[in-house]
Amino acid sequence: MAANMYRVGDYVYFENSSSNPYLIRRIEELNKTANGNVEAKVVCFYRRRDISSTLIALADKHATLSVCYKAGPGADNGEEGEIEEEMENPEMVDLPEKLKHQLRHRELFLSRQLESLPATHIRGKCSVTLLNETESLKSYLEREDFFFYSLVYDPQQKTLLADKGEIRVGNRYQADITDLLKEGEEDGRDQSRLETQVWEAHNPLTDKQIDQFLVVARSVGTFARALDCSSSVRQPSLHMSAAAASRDITLFHAMDTLHKNIYDISKAISALVPQGGPVLCRDEMEEWSASEANLFEEALEKYGKDFTDIQQDFLPWKSLTSIIEYYYMWKTTDRYVQQKRLKAAEAESKLKQVYIPNYNKPNPNQISVNNVKAGVVNGTGAPGQSPGAGRACESCYTTQSYQWYSWGPPNMQCRLCASCWTYWKKYGGLKMPTRLDGERPGPNRSNMSPHGLPARSSGSPKFAMKTRQAFYLHTTKLTRIARRLCREILRPWHAARHPYLPINSAAIKAECTARLPEASQSPLVLKQAVRKPLEAVLRYLETHPRPPKPDPVKSVSSVLSSLTPAKVAPVINNGSPTILGKRSYEQHNGVDGNMKKRLLMPSRGLANHGQARHMGPSRNLLLNGKSYPTKVRLIRGGSLPPVKRRRMNWIDAPDDVFYMATEETRKIRKLLSSSETKRAARRPYKPIALRQSQALPPRPPPPAPVNDEPIVIED
């Protein structure tokens, strides 16, 4: 009963998706809606997986400790030399990788964001605490449903801030404690230099005379406010001016003036009313305008007594000292008393707690025999067996569990056991790092753009193109060994012909581990690569010379001058053939038959397909170039209009390219200058030629000539 009772201030799990981890929230309010349901106003906490990798790197940098220590040689001479180092927490170094991985799941990031969620989505309680530097990190792992935080995340600004002020540690910031003095022993310090006297208790004035002087000081303050224009606007009535003049700042200034004038009342009154006019003393309550006071109350309602955030977001033109001073003066006003009574009345009417029964509905991600398709006969599973059957748990690699849950992308067919599924829902990660972790580095990806036209366009969907999805497989040594040791189980040729069938990687890994000791005794014989001799390569290059370079593109004027009527000739389209053996223009036009016959046929009602055409120098319209002027009209039989010709067929778009640099290519890249690198990027079809001076290291300078003869200086 008590476990299902949730109160204001509890940290709870919320479920917003059946496959995603729970949300961690703190209940601020419990409100009852008009239809009778209960909504919880909660404070959001974010996991590491919810924020960007850049902010995660900043959080890890914040977690490093700054160690300060004294240098040995300088301490003897009375000189303090301090060296600051950044080093990792020694306790984190001692933790194994598995515990480090699980400890990251316990870290949260507090936010100031509030949201309202249905109370029926609560799935349990948890505990969240501020990171305690004196506690052991293992203590957070030993307690169930326990989390910690140290930074504040702003989801709007995408920033991280420290939740508490940092205390500087070291000899430069801490005082040196002296030895305890014996009874009657003096410390030898001059107290007059260390302290400033502001009031004499044994003064010649009586209490009645001091009270009368303070009444005169209040009167002077009221008269000064009547003369001040800004004060008369803020305190339009005499009653308000007298109340403002009776505040502490006026009385403290009067007593300080009396002390400076050696408790002579006549001199003190003369100091309160100098020649320029009466002295006006105002505190923060008078300095702040009504709009600033309303902003402060709004900020206090949102942030509480977090004065740093109040200054940054609401009152950046006010100092932190001014805000704190105004807060304590504001607590003495009637406005504060009224708001306190209203909040108490609202709290009485609101819900204090709510009972949520256990959630017993089955999860849609559960894997059962009834909701899966039968396995393929030629696949790894038997007939009637689920495609994921035989797979180990992606987290703990177990093959036995009373309940399995699908996890990850559907095409991966990954699954988790019951205990790892509960861990995933609560902590937002797996017990062990997996292949789906986003922290692992991947290959650099480059999308090629043909002729400068982007393959993926964010404009009209008519011009948008999408290439076939590419992938990159980077195998490990154990995978390459398993291909040879477990060939009869893996059946690589069969798997290559049927890439959609799953492979039982757990069974292959176990079999490879068992056969590995025997295979080490008889080393594998690798097939040697047969390389042709240099003479054969040279002979081939002589018989197959490089084709000549194309002529440079002529200007439009030369094209106009050379346009002459010619007979009809077949048009050769440079588009690449598609899967069905047709060119891209054939798919656009939808015309079959012989190319020569189509050109001699009548237009058949198709637009821009006239028989008469002018032949000139061959020049294609570039995709990224400028079109011909509007006066020049080039009509080509059996071709497309220029606007339609610029559109690329998605089948003709190139596949993605993965470039894996080697040590040799990295060395060559360092030899190129910045201009040569940019030139090669602009013209990728041209070979890069290295000069001999670039390839060879610079020669050392020649030695200076040595002259054995003495130098004679004549007068």
UniProtKB/Swiss-Prot annotation:
Q: Which InterPro entries match?
A: BAH_dom (IPR001025), BAH_sf (IPR043151), ELM2_dom (IPR000949), Homeodomain-like_sf (IPR009057), MIER/MTA (IPR040138), MTA1_R1 (IPR035170), SANT/Myb (IPR001005), SANT_dom (IPR017884)
Q: Taxonomically, what lineage is the organism?
A: Eukaryota, Metazoa, Chordata, Craniata, Vertebrata
Report motif location: SH3-binding.
545-552, 696-705
The similarity comment for this entry is:
Belongs to the metastasis-associated protein family.
Q: Where is this region: Disordered?
A: 435-460, 673-715
Q: Where is this cross-link: Glycyl lysine isopeptide (Lys-Gly) (interchain with G-Cter in SUMO2)?
A: 549
Where is each SANT domain found? 283-335
Phosphothreonine modification, residue list: 564, 578
Query: Changing residue 509 to R: reported impact?
Result: Reduced sumoylation and transcriptional corepressor activity
Q: What is the name of this protein?
A: Metastasis-associated protein MTA1
Here the cross-link named Glycyl lysine isopeptide (Lys-Gly) (interchain with G-Cter in SUMO2 and SUMO3) sits at 509
Q: Which organism is it from?
A: Homo sapiens
Where are the residues linked by the Glycyl lysine isopeptide (Lys-Gly) (interchain with G-Cter in ubiquitin) cross-link?
182, 626
Pfam short name (any one): GATA
Where found?
Nucleus
Motif SUMO interaction motif 1 (SIM): chain residues: 711-715
Q: Which disease is it linked to?
A: Involved in the epigenetic regulation of ESR1 expression in breast cancer in a TFAP2C, IFI16 and HDAC4/5/6-dependent manner.
* Keyword entries, A-Z: Acetylation, Activator, Biological rhythms, Cytoplasm, Cytoskeleton, DNA-binding, Isopeptide bond, Metal-binding, Nucleus, Phosphoprotein, Repressor, Transcription, Transcription regulation, Ubl conjugation, Zinc, Zinc-finger
Residue ranges of every copy of the ELM2 domain listed in the record: 165-276
The protein's role, per its UniProt record: Transcriptional coregulator which can act as both a transcriptional corepressor and coactivator. Acts as a component of the histone deacetylase NuRD complex which participates in the remodeling of chromatin. In the NuRD complex, regulates transcription of its targets by modifying the acetylation status of the target chromatin and cofactor accessibility to the target DNA. In conjunction with other components of NuRD, acts as a transcriptional corepressor of BRCA1, ESR1, TFF1 and CDKN1A. Acts as a transcriptional coactivator of BCAS3, and SUMO2, independent of the NuRD complex.
